[in-house]
Amino acid sequence: MEVHHHAHTERKKWTHYLWEFIMLFLAVFCGFLAENQREHYIEHQREKQYMRSLLEDLQTDTTTINRVHRRALTQLSFLDSLIELGNHSPAKADDIHKLYFLQGKTTRFLNIRFEDGTSSQLKNAGGMRLIRKEEVAKAIREYWDHIESLYRVRDRLELAGETIADVSSRIFYTGYFIKSDDPLDPVSGIKTGAKFIYDDQRLIAEYINRIATKATRTRIYLAELEDGLRSANNLLQIIKEAYHLSADRRTPLEK
């Protein structure tokens, strides 16, 4: 009678299982590294895209600052002339005509608005965490601080203009102003025979005092505009160098 023997498979050594584990671990780890590298690449591309967009915003901002600065300088010149002429008492007919003209040249609000599309994304969508370069992040925050400061000074300047309107409406007849079609220069001239509504020296003195306040705030506004422009140009340069981007070089304030 034949006896059948069961075949015995050779047991695998523990080193075999160790190598299987190592190979599996390496496969998972390499996959993790590849995915991590991919995420870093995507974030780096997003960072660079943000910087390109911010660069374009900064170019627009510097143009805006230069434009508003020129207008503020012109208006300040009219304000100073208005103060000097208004302190002459009593005003002659020729002086009244000049005061009307200068009043018409100093009423426009010197508003400014910065491009905030990219900045809003950086602030609200967690974009700042993508900015790996500390020098860039610091320069961006400093620029934002300058913008906020400019807005505060702008609002105070607007308030000064509103307080002037309360008094000027009791001094000047609007009918003597010759209107223009240019929104940037709404008064083109003054009609002959211009008179004050109330030729009251105390009222005129109050008006001139408020004009002086606006002139002071305009000077502060000019200084803030210059600081803002320096900050914008500094940020432009830092971004261009850090990310090897090109942009039109901004010129200093044209005075």
Residue ranges and their predicted role:
Residues 1-15, 36-255:
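Long, hydrophobic alpha-helical segments that serve as membrane-spanning/inserting helices
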Residues 20-33:
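Hydrophobic membrane-insertion alpha-helices, especially the h-region
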